[in-house]
């Protein structure tokens, strides 16, 4: 009787593991199909090496632009591009909050805004942090 109980428990555990493994693979497969981007370093290398770009290929987005300073942020609806004093740039999350986030919606001007408040992380804050003032 005890052996049958052990066998039944083992069979249920094995069946449950197979079902969860199937569901996990099923869900992962759906995500992979939605993600059209590069998945491995080899694929990334292939995309870069086979690019037809004769100017500058942005490493984060794969877009062909005139110069590195024209590369967009990977997530432009939620990020702003802040220029550093040395000419490079970093992408940071747009500041959020009531009455604040609307100021940062225009990509042509959002990098110029400085709230002059160290509690609001915008491009002004990035420049102050770069100079060691934060």
Swiss-Prot record:
InterPro entries listed in its UniProt record: LCL2
Record-annotated membrane-spanning stretches: none
Key words of the record: Signal
Family: Belongs to the LCL2 family.
The keyword Kinase is assigned to this record: no
Biological processes per GO annotation: ERAD pathway
Functional summary from the UniProt entry: Probable component of the endoplasmic reticulum-associated degradation (ERAD) pathway.
Highest taxon above the source species: Eukaryota
Signal peptide start and end residues: 1-17
This protein's encoding gene: LCL2
Name of the protein this chain belongs to: Long chronological lifespan protein 2
């Amino acid at each position: 009787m005890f052996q049958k109980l052990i066998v039944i428990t083992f069979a249920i555990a094995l069946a449950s593991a197979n079902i969860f493994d199937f569901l996990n693979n099923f869900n992962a497969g759906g995500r992979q199909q939605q993600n059209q981007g590069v998945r491995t370093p080899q694929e990334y290398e292939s995309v870069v090496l086979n690019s037809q770009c004769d100017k500058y290929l942005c490493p984060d987005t794969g877009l062909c632009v005139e110069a590195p300073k024209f590369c967009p942020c990977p997530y432009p609806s939620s990020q702003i591009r802040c220029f550093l004093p040395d000419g490079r740039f970093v992408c940071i999350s747009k500041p959020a909050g009531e009455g604040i986030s609307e100021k940062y919606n225009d990509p042509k001007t959002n990098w110029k805004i400085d709230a002059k408040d160290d509690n609001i992380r915008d491009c002004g804050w990035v420049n102050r942090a770069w100079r060691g003032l934060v």
